[in-house]
């Protein structure tokens, strides 16, 4: 796999963080930030937690892309939940 960009703020590079989605120019995992959002941290607190390496527009982009992924794969997720 080669380096790919998703939107303005997200990239994946097999040489960085084992090829997991990160915020461009950082080693901050998208999944970690989504977890912080899910745990109720404010966006300002998330930005502080990430030492200012990400921005509000970057967090918004991640949430939008997560929403698109859920919408695209909703049937798969429902099947997985039903089998648990």
Which residues make up each language-model segment?
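Hydrophobic packing positions characteristic
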Residues: 1-2
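Long, charge-rich, low-complexity alpha-helical segments
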Residues: 29-84
